[in-house]
Amino acid sequence: LLWKGVVVLVAIFVIVTLLRVLYVSKNTPAQVAKIHATKLTMDDVMGVNLPSDPGAEADKTVAGIDANKNGIRDDVELAIFKEYPNSAKTRAVLLQYALALQMEMTLPILNRETATAVVEDNQSKALKCIWSISSRSDMDKFTAETDKNENFVKDRQINTEDRKKYMHNFYKYVGSYSVSDDWCDIDVSVLKN
């Protein structure tokens, strides 16, 4: 009787595993397409639909709160607007990086293909976007400015132990990739400040 119970449990485990593999293999291409299609908008940069402050709710889950559904965690979005109320260029590059990091934290399917797609298409592009608003005439100043901008977002986005653990696990899935040829989702040269 015990032997039959073990066989039934193993059979259930195998069936559940096969169903999961089928689900992931069927849905991964759609998820990768969604990753490639997700872009920052001018409305995001200009604060057209700013969310309210989520308060303590922001840190209760890895994903946090995105009430305005723009792909950027609300507390991070509000921090960027608070710090840079008069610089649309800086907001644009920081929001794009926040969007990329949030995509990493909210993937419904986490596997090598989706993790690599987010880093290759969105994170590498967002970092290049951050670099685009700093002059390279003084490389020490360039490095300091770009590090400051990158860390401003990263320190707010990856700000709990659960988020740090999640990101550590996320990067285990990233395969080799080439850096995106694209830069910013928004043409920052059209922004006055």
Outline where the language-model segments fall.
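Calcium-binding acidic motifs and repeat modules
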Residues: 1-69, 75-193
